[in-house]
């Protein structure tokens, strides 16, 4: 299926993508590769990013082990700021003008999230990286990605992960699992397909923002998926 071309997109990167082959933290070579993938398409689109923090700290997992949930979630938000700065650094090293905006104000390291300012950055050809989730506990970075995509008027939300789309079962556990080319938001919610958390999916559904799930670990795949030729799943109404 040929996916339509878009003008403004939001790219959600899971924190785990930045680990490379490691089990924790940030792998500079992987971040540099991802930055090159982004730079290759940045001249054709107005591009925003949301980066997860799971490679450094997972609030939900920490809460399950006894951390106060609110404190754990704030720690997870701070982890996303570290990742955002790492991606910004990698992009600017290859000449891509970038701004980081945080939902939690920290003026010494990045801008606060101001939608109108973010709009101006995009209009000037800069990439805007949104950090610190929504700024509120109990919300995932998937929800933050959906929220920012809606606020910024993005035409689509691209989720770059370590899998090549959405399956009707876990392909790592079930060899007969089938990958969807397209699937509706309502099917994702009804069947509890693991695309994003339910609040993020519902927000995209209600604002008619398609979600494209693809494997960003595969070199060159971001450009192929944006062109409509890569392997991915599109979630839409």
UniProtKB/Swiss-Prot annotation:
Pfam families: AA_kinase. This is Uridylate kinase. GO terms for biological process: 'de novo' CTP biosynthetic process; UDP biosynthetic process. It comes from Rhizorhabdus wittichii (strain DSM 6014 / CCUG 31198 / JCM 15750 / NBRC 105917 / EY 4224 / RW1). NCBIfam families: pyrH_bact. It is found in: Cytoplasm. UMP binds at residues 53, 73, 134-141. ATP binds at residues 12-15, 54, 58, 161, 167, 170. Pathway: Pyrimidine metabolism; CTP biosynthesis via de novo pathway; UDP from UMP (UMPK route): step 1/1.
């Amino acid at each position: 299926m040929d996916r339509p071309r878009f003008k403004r997109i939001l790219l959600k990167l899971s924190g785990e993508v930045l680990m490379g082959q490691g089990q924790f933290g940030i792998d500079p070579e992987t971040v540099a590769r991802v930055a090159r993938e982004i730079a290759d398409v940045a001249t054709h689109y107005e591009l925003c990013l949301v980066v997860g923090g799971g490679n450094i700290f997972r609030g939900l997992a920490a809460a399950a082990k006894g951390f106060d949930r609110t404190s754990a979630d704030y720690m997870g938000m701070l982890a996303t700021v570290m990742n955002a700065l790492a991606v910004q650094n990698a992009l600017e090293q290859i000449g891509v003008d970038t701004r980081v905006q945080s939902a939690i104000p920290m003026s010494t390291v990045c801008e606060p999230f101001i939608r109108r300012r973010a709009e101006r950055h995009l209009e000037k050809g800069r990439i805007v990286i949104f950090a610190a989730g929504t700024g509120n506990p109990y919300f995932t970075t998937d929800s933050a990605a959906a929220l920012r995509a809606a606020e910024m008027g993005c035409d689509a939300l691209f989720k770059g992960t370590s899998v090549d789309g959405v399956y009707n079962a876990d392909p790592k556990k079930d060899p007969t699992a089938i990958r969807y080319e397209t699937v509706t938001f309502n099917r994702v919610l009804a069947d509890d397909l693991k695309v994003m958390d339910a609040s993020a999916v519902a927000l995209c559904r209600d604002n008619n923002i398609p979600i494209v799930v693809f494997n960003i670990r595969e070199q060159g795949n971001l450009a192929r998926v944006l062109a409509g030729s890569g392997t991915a799943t599109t979630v839409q109404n």
